[in-house]
């Protein structure tokens, strides 16, 4: 297993109310990698229109006859819209009880894998105990994320595996603010600098 993450790796980005890019309004993003070359993360609180069985069919992991054999939890497994970059590519954030050669340890107990094998394992209920599947990712070139943070585009917060994998998708934005001690109704879109 590889280890990566960087300064912001394993942290949450929470969009400020003044976020100008409509793709990221009220977004909560888990940063998987951050370095001088840029950053990449997965949006946690946006569902993708494609379901997990359809994704498995599209990737050739199963055929149409095998779709009916999937368990109910697997049929209902949500797929997230991970971001606008590489939107047809799958990414899995997961607990550290699953690893292959391509798995990257992002933070304590949180890994990242982008292979067909992990999707096969999840579909057979032999994958990690906790997983979040996304299509696409959010990416920033060198210095771009830092510039957005300095102009109050994002809040930065720590997270936990339970928040990442178990909290309600529709409440993730408000919950992430509350965990920071911020009442979402009082958060304003404009901030000053001292």
Curated annotation (Swiss-Prot):
Give TM segment ranges. Answer: none
Instruction: Note the superkingdom of the native organism.
Output: Bacteria
Q: Which GO terms describe its cellular component?
A: cytosol
* Pfam families, A to Z: DUF179
Task: Please give the family membership noted in the entry.
Answer: Belongs to the UPF0301 (AlgH) family.
Protein known as: UPF0301 protein BH04450
